[in-house]
C-alpha cells in the first residue's frame, strides 16, 4: 500500500483547501519528496527485497527488533460552536422551524472535518511505515553484517582452535617420544657407567694389590742384589786369596824339590855315585807327573769356584761362605804341615825323594778337593 502511493495530487489539495474548516488552524501539509529521498526509498526497497522482506515483515525474532517510535497525532478537536437548540423560532410570525439549516451546516462541517482528518492521517501513517521500514532495514542490515562477521570470526576461531589443538597434540606426542628416548638413552648410559665403574673398581683393587706386591718384591730384589754384589765381591777376594795360596804352595814345592835335587847331587858326589839313565828318566817322569797334578789341582780349584758361585739367593751364599772359611783355614795348616813334613822327611831320608813328593802332592790334592 505504501509502495504505490506517491503523495496528493493538485486537485485533491485544492479540494481539501476549499473544504477546509475556517475555524481549524491551518496545518502544514507534507511537501513533495526530493529526489534523494526517493532514491533512498528505492534503495531501501531493493535491499528489503534482497533480504526477503515482504510488507515490512522481518526474519529476526521479535525480541531482537527495535521498538518503533510512537507517533503523536494531533487529535485536537476543532473549536465547535456552542450547542444551539435544534428548533429555533424565528421572530417572524410565519411559525416555520429554522433548525434544519443549522443542522445541515453542522453536518457539512463534520464531513469536512472528517475528510481533512483522513487526508492528514494517511500521509502520516505512510511516513511512519516508511521510517519504520528504514529503521528495520538499517538495523537488520547492521545486525546481519554483525552476525555474518561474528559467524566468520567464530569459524576462524574454531579453525584456529582446531589447528592449535592439533599442533599441541603433535608437539605433546613428539615431546613424549623425545622424553622416552632420552630416558632410554639415560638408562643405557647409566648401565654402562655402572658396568664400567664396577670393572674400574675391581681393576683398581687389583692394581693396588699388584703395586704392593711389586714394592715388596722390589725391596727383596734390592736386598738380594745388594747381597749378591757383596757376596760376589767376597767370592772374588776369596778366589784371589786361594789362587795366591796355591801359587805360593807350588813355588814352595818347586823350591823344595830343587833343594832336594841339589842335596842329592851333593850326596852323590860325596859318595862317588854316578847317576845312570834310569834315574834321570825317573826324575823327568816325576817332574812331569808333578806338573800334571798341579794342572789338575788348578782345574779342580776352578771347578769348585764355579760350583760355589751364588745362584741368586743369599742363603746359599752365606752357606758357601761359612763352608769356605773353615776349609781354607783347614787347608792352609795342612799345606804348611805337609810342607814341613816333606821337608823333614826329605832331610831325614834323602834316599826316597820320589815317594815323599808323591805323597805330599796327593795330600795337597785331597785337602783341596775336600
UniProtKB/Swiss-Prot annotation:
Residues 1-106, 320-370 are annotated as: Disordered. GO terms for biological process: non-motile cilium assembly. Residues 185-370 are annotated as: Necessary for interaction with RCHY1. Residues 142-284 form a coiled coil. Keywords: Coiled coil, Cytoplasm, Golgi apparatus. Its main location: cytoplasm. InterPro entries: GORAB. GO terms for cellular component: Golgi apparatus. The keyword Cytoplasm applies. It holds the Pfam family Transcrip_act. The keyword Coiled coil applies. Residues 11-27, 349-361 have a biased composition (Basic and acidic residues). It comes from the Eukaryota. It is found in: Cytoplasm; Golgi apparatus. Interacts with RCHY1, RAB6A/RAB6 and SCYL1. Belongs to the GORAB family. This is RAB6-interacting golgin. The lineage of its organism: Eukaryota, Metazoa, Chordata, Craniata, Vertebrata. The gene is GORAB.
